[in-house]
Amino acid sequence: MTLPVSDPAAWATAMNNLGMAPLGIAGQPILPDFDPALGMMTGIPPITPMMPGLGIVPPPIPPDMPVAKEIIHCKSCTLFPPNPNLPPPATRERPPGCKTVFVGGLPENGTEQIIVEVFEQCGEIIAIRKSKKNFCHIRFAEEYMVDKALYLSGYRIRLGSSTDKKDTGRLHVDFAQARDDLYEWECKQRMLAREERHRRRMEEERMRPPSPPPVVHYSDHECSIVAEKLKDDSKFSEAVQTLLTWIERGEVNRRSANHFYSMIQSANSHVRRLVNEKATHEKEMEEAKEKFKQALSGILIQFEQIVAVYHSASKQKAWDHFTKAQRKNISVWCKQAEEIRNIHNDELMGIRREEEMEMSDDEIEETTETKETEESALVSQAEALKEENDSLRWQLDAYRNEVELLKQEQGKAHREDDPNKEQQLKLLQQALQGMQQHLLKVQEEYKKKEAELDRIKDDNLQVEQLLENFHEKQENCGSRLCASSQEGEQPLEKTAVSNPVKSEREALLVGIISTFLHVHPFGASIEYICSYLNRLDNKASYQIPSKLTTSPLLPISTSDVESLMSRLQHTFRQEMTGVGASLEKRWKFCGFEGLKLT
């Protein structure tokens, strides 16, 4: 029975006879043109093993779109597609290397010839195992052919034009497990692993450095050739390796010793050349370092200029005219430029530190300031003691050497000279002991002088700090006294009560004593304070006029200082420390506490 492919009415009648709903729309061809030479619908593209997805027949279709399959005509049967609205048939998990499929739902009257006729379109069939219960197993030649066979799952098969139940069936195609497939797949995997190992081995052998050529055995002819190569700079490395191998093999003997010596001498002549080359390379390295440092300095200067531009743009005069986005970009750029500048600056400073470390101590010494007369005298004394100490140590070593020589001569001399040499030895030992004692005394004196020198340095530092504080206090007190002099005059009694400081001199004294007691938190006696003031007075050529005598200039007295400090109760406080004979009066600075009380 032959039906025109393009006649929709004829196909609708045939499908009604089978009890199936007609597919397609009236007035349109249900099936595309069929090419009998292909044995399949022309709408299906040709299948090749090189297609992606192991040669799956249908192209990728969106999951929400139903698959419309075509009717397939064979010589003895016809395959009708399933309803496209039904879900696709379920399949089991694909075994590795699967080439065998399970085909169920065959017609009862179906033969092996019909099965071959239907599935030979999917590919070459190796074997068919048919069962009596309407199913069979088909083994294909390649794995991609299994995917073609799965495409026929769900089709209705009809033998000829019969509508008998034994001549119809619904095909169910699924993956099947077969030991032959698994064995072939394992063999293939092992073959691929062998190929991969071989490829890696070849790659490793290719990357491996070539083995050195074998060294020839020693002979007079080869010795002359190596001697000539040793004189050539380009062939020196090869020749010296040969020479080293010969010496390690034990080729040196009496007959060949002169030849080997001449070759070693030739190798030694290259030392000066290598030293000159090293010096040349070092010079080039220094020049490259200098160029790099100069280039880095230029880059750093440009970075500084860029950062300065950003900072000037960030000032309010120009900043207010930029938009918000422009300000954000300028801030980000400025931050990035500062980070890069800091990195370059650290690198440049590291180079400079390395250069400074290479310099000798004499080049990095700086000239110190001139010391005071007492300090310079102590330094000169310490240097003199050090020189004397060194000279005594050298004399001591000389005496020890003489003693050793005398001991050696004493064993060789005759016995008749023994009394004289023993006496001389005793004298030398006594002189040695005296020198050792003198050396110990000099060392102790040297240590004392050094300790005294350190103490004087510390005192000088403290005095300099106090002088600075004194000048600051003097300026502050002078400004305050000028401001107070502009106020109206008040009675003498009220002035004495409200202002305990009577003159500018006393104000300066108060400032100096406050500074002194501030650095002595545990207080100081009145004698200690006056001695400090007198010493400071001698240093600064400054004296306080006494209000009790008619002499204009007198040294600072204890009573004046104590009366001044007694009037300032919120600034100075007197405390008693100790018990019994160790009882002592100490003055402390309490100016900050007085601020809270006032």
From Swiss-Prot:
One of its GO terms (biological process) is electron transport chain. Residues 99-178 form the RRM domain. Keywords: Biological rhythms, Cell membrane, Coiled coil, Copper, Electron transport, Glycoprotein, Growth regulation, Membrane, NAD, Oxidoreductase, Secreted, Transport. The lineage of its organism: Eukaryota, Metazoa, Chordata, Craniata, Vertebrata. Its main location: membrane. SMART domains: RRM. SUPFAM superfamilies: RNA-binding domain, RBD (SSF54928). May be involved in cell growth. Probably acts as a terminal oxidase of plasma electron transport from cytosolic NAD(P)H via hydroquinones to acceptors at the cell surface. Hydroquinone oxidase activity alternates with a protein disulfide-thiol interchange/oxidoreductase activity which may control physical membrane displacements associated with vesicle budding or cell enlargement. The activities oscillate with a period length of 22 minutes and play a role in control of the ultradian cellular biological clock. Glycosylated. It comes from Mus musculus. GO terms for molecular function: oxidoreductase activity; RNA binding. This is Ecto-NOX disulfide-thiol exchanger 2. It is found in: Cell membrane; Secreted, Extracellular space. Its EC number is 1.-.-.-. InterPro entries: ENOX, ENOX1/2_dom, ENOX_RRM, Nucleotide-bd_a/b_plait_sf, RBD_domain_sf, RRM_dom. GO terms for cellular component: external side of plasma membrane; extracellular region. The keyword NAD applies. Residues 264-299, 352-476 form a coiled coil.
